[in-house]
Amino acid sequence: MDNKQELRCWAKEKRKNISIDNNLLVKNLMQTEAYRNAKNILIFYPLKYEVNLLSLLKDKTKNFYLPKIDGESLLCCPFCEGDELCESCFKTLEPITDPCKKQMIDLVVVPALCCDKKNYRLGYGGGFYDRFLNDFCGTKIVCLPKKLLVDTVYPEEFDIPVDLVITENYM
């Protein structure tokens, strides 16, 4: 593969054939120091074939947030198990709650199609998370199956690496 677009296509096809152990990925995330120390955590509502982290919502010692797209920005909205969601312009589910200040978030679990050895992630190409992470001061983590780790995701100057990539084998 020679570019991000080819890699996106490869990763989307690959993950259709991967059995994701969501419980193990959640367990491994919960064992990290970053998770244990965080109070306010931004996760994402999973798309088909994505890692599903929603079982984290059972942890009542944490406050959870889901992203909401507003123009070019990604907002952080409080979310609890059972809260109402609405469909966004991208056909993803978003909370209907009012957003909080980004500075409140201690930890963000970022969605990714795949990640490389330098902790760069390949997203869907909209740049929402890269813009969000540009001045984010908390910890950035990706959880994904180890079969979606690659040599490079062809990072560009605006791409932001995460602090930690968690797989079934932990890190």
Language model features with spans:
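Charged helix-capping and loop-helix junction motifs
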Residues: 58, 123-129
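Surface-exposed, charge/polar-rich loops and edge strands
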Residues: 2-4, 103-108, 117-120, 131-171
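N-terminal active-site beta-alpha-beta segment that forms phosphate/nucleotide-binding
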Residues: 1-101
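A residue-level signal for conserved active-site and pocket-lining positions in enzyme catalytic cores
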Residues: 11, 43, 64, 109, ...
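Short, structured patches in soluble enzyme cores that scaffold and shape functional sites
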Residues: 68, 78, 94, 112, ...
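Short glycine-rich anion-binding loops that position phosphate/pyrophosphate groups of nucleotides
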Residues: 46-49, 113-117
